[in-house]
């Protein structure tokens, strides 16, 4: 019996790893356009509306003005995304609450971001989902899922900017056009991955679909035990980053 299990288990695992790219490639799509539609809070899913309302008050206390709440449409397969977008024009910092309506229930995270004249940007968020396709090398993303308070996350974001973009001044956006920055970031994802041959634009030009290269990478990185190992490594890296930031802050206080 034990010998049978030892033989069957690798066979099943191998079959799953062999079939997963086919399933992912046939199902996964990324929208080519980010069609942002303003939406009132009372038209949102009850849980998403409550989360946006709570965060709007918290961000206002931090000096961030609400740009608006938007329906982003189906940016990826089997999801519908919504965003509450904020801007602090005094510091040229941006913030957002992103929520996704999914078959297994809504999920959300908060984020602060800064962009610079050299084309780089730094994002600090609470998103626990790791990307399965290569990230933009010009966008440094720090994911601290253990942080829930916007004030704490903003403090960490500013420490991260000071560490990784010293001397660079954040760039703002003209008033009443701030949300276009969000649209540019989202719409830049597909073409960038297509240039790296992980995705390709479908015949209708409305969405990007995975190439075999992208499907294999996405499927295998999303399967256990790879996903477990990736999360453990990332969690350790972010804990180390927080300790490093704390050490830098303490050293700065001692010099003051």
PLM features: residue spans?
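Polar/charged alpha-helical tracts
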Residues: 37-46, 50, 54-57, 137-138, ...
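Hydrophobic core of alpha-helical transmembrane segments in multi-pass integral membrane proteins
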Residues: 9-17
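Feature marks short, highly hydrophobic, charge-poor N-terminal signal-anchor/signal peptide-like helices
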Residues: 1-10
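N-terminal topogenic membrane-targeting module
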Residues: 19-82
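A eukaryote-biased signal for long
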Residues: 164-256
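Structured extramembrane domains adjacent to transmembrane segments
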Residues: 60-205
């Amino acid at each position: 019996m034990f010998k049978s299990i030892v033989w069957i288990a690798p066979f099943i695992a191998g079959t799953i790893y062999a079939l997963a790219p086919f399933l992912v490639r046939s199902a996964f799509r990324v929208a080519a356009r980010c069609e942002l539609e303003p939406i009132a809070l009372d038209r949102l899913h009850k849980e998403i509306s409550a989360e946006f309302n709570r965060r709007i008050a918290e961000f206002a206390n931090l000096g961030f003005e609400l740009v608006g709440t938007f329906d982003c449409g189906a940016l990826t397969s089997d999801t519908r995304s919504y965003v509450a977008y904020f801007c602090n024009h005094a510091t040229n910092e941006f913030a957002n609450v992103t929520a996704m309506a999914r078959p297994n229930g809504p999920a959300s995270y908060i984020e602060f971001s800064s962009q610079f004249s050299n084309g780089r940007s730094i994002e600090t968020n609470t998103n626990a989902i790791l990307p399965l396709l290569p990230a933009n090398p010009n966008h440094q993303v720090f994911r601290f899922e253990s942080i829930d308070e916007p004030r704490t996350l903003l403090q960490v974001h500013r420490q991260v900017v000071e560490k990784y973009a010293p001397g660079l001044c954040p760039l703002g956006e003209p008033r009443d056009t701030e949300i276009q920055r969000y649209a540019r970031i989202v719409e830049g994802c597909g073409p960038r991955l297509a240039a790296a041959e992980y995705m390709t634009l479908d015949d209708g030009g409305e969405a990007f679909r995975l190439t075999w290269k992208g499907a294999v990478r996405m499927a295998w990185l999303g399967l256990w035990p790879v996903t477990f190992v990736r999360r453990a490594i990332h969690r350790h890296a972010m804990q180390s980053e927080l300790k490093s930031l704390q050490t830098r802050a303490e050293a700065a206080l001692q010099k003051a």
